[in-house]
């Protein structure tokens, strides 16, 4: 059984009806994965990549836990000026990659396109926009 896919299906079921519940499930899933990778690290993955994975997950979790102190950026945006104002900066591409890890990107992309976002837009950005529009 693919537990990640099953968990993603549960998130999709809640997303349109109870977005706050879907957000909680995403945060819980990220916390569980962060703990799993700390307790049972993949020894074949270079240590720097393992550390980067934790930093990315913690960055996304901080943004999801405290949206009032967060700003979404992209991989090309200089974030230092926003950090000077105490904002937690998170790359939308980073968040989108985690949504793909939950296997819910198809749902979010379809939602964004149904809201009028062009099908030619980058799928990572449609993934992000779908998540934002859903709440």
What do these predicted ranges mean?
Residues 1-135:
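An N-terminal assembly and electron-transfer interface module characteristic of large anaerobic redox
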């Amino acid at each position: 059984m693919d537990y990640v896919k099953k968990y993603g299906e549960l998130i999709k079921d809640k997303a349109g009806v109870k977005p706050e519940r879907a957000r909680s499930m995403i945060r819980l899933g990220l916390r569980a994965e962060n703990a799993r990778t700390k307790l049972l690290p993949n020894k074949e993955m270079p240590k720097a990549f393992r550390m980067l994975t934790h930093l990315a997950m913690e960055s996304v979790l901080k943004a999801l836990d405290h949206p009032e102190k967060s700003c979404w950026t992209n991989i090309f945006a200089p974030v230092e000026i926003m950090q000077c104002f105490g904002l937690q900066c998170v790359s939308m591409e980073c968040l989108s990659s985690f949504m793909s890890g939950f296997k819910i990107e198809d749902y979010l992309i379809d939602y964004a396109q149904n809201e009028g976002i062009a099908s030619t837009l980058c799928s990572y950005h449609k993934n992000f926009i779908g998540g934002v529009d859903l709440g």
